[in-house]
């Protein structure tokens, strides 16, 4: 088993190398909108999982996840050789690419929070306009009995 700090440093370095290689060296058009978000390395430093997200060409366009996965699978050998040259470890870890679902989940969570805020604002508006039912002072006092 290897030191956890070393594994974290190696994972960070792998994500930097892969991101740089995708941006500047790999000329596959399917990888234009791929962003490397994280990497994790196993305890024996033999396998690395690289997490990525894919953006659409425009804000409203749906990302092409399948094309990005195919492009990463095709470039896996080149990226592994870049990782080997850039890290200097005895055994270059094999790379596995996994689509990162965190940004999509965060976007959905933001939409839910926005809907909840709108509902809270509506409830506050209705509550501000509300009036009490009945008399302002519904409790009987001794003064009322004397009259």
UniProtKB/Swiss-Prot annotation:
Gene Ontology biological-process annotations: maturation of SSU-rRNA
Assigned keywords, A-Z: Cytoplasm, Ribosome biogenesis
Transmembrane segments: none
Predominant subcellular localization, coarse grouping: cytoplasm
Gene3D superfamilies, A to Z: 3.30.300.20
Chloroplast as UniProt keyword: no
InterPro entries in UniProt: KH_dom-like_a/b (IPR015946), RbfA (IPR000238), RbfA_dom_sf (IPR023799), Ribosome-bd_factorA_CS (IPR020053)
GO CC terms: cytosol
Subcellular location per the Swiss-Prot or TrEMBL entry: Cytoplasm
Keyword Cytoplasm: yes
Highest taxon above the source species: Bacteria
Region (Disordered): 127-147
Pfam families reported in the protein's UniProt record: RBFA
Subunit: Monomer. Binds 30S ribosomal subunits, but not 50S ribosomal subunits or 70S ribosomes.
PANTHER family listed in its UniProt record: RIBOSOME-BINDING FACTOR A, CHLOROPLASTIC-RELATED (PTHR33515:SF1)
General function of this protein: One of several proteins that assist in the late maturation steps of the functional core of the 30S ribosomal subunit. Associates with free 30S ribosomal subunits (but not with 30S subunits that are part of 70S ribosomes or polysomes). Required for efficient processing of 16S rRNA. May interact with the 5'-terminal helix region of 16S rRNA.
Descriptive protein name: Ribosome-binding factor A
């Amino acid at each position: 088993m290897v030191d956890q700090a070393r594994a974290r440093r190696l994972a960070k370095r792998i994500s930097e190398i892969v991101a740089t290689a995708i941006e500047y060296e790999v000329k596959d058009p399917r990888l234009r909108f791929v962003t490397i978000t994280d990497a994790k390395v196993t305890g024996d430093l033999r396998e690395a999982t690289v997490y990525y997200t894919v953006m659409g060409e425009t804000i409203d366009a749906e990302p092409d996840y399948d094309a990005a996965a195919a492009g990463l699978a095709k470039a896996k050998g080149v990226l592994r050789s870049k990782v080997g040259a850039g890290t200097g470890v005895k055994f270059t870890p094999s790379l596995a690419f996994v689509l990162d679902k965190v940004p999509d989940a965060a976007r959905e969570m933001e939409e839910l929070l926005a809907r909840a805020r709108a509902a809270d604002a509506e409830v506050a508006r209705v509550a501000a306009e509300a009036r009490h039912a009945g008399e302002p002072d519904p409790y009987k006092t001794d003064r009322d009995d004397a009259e």
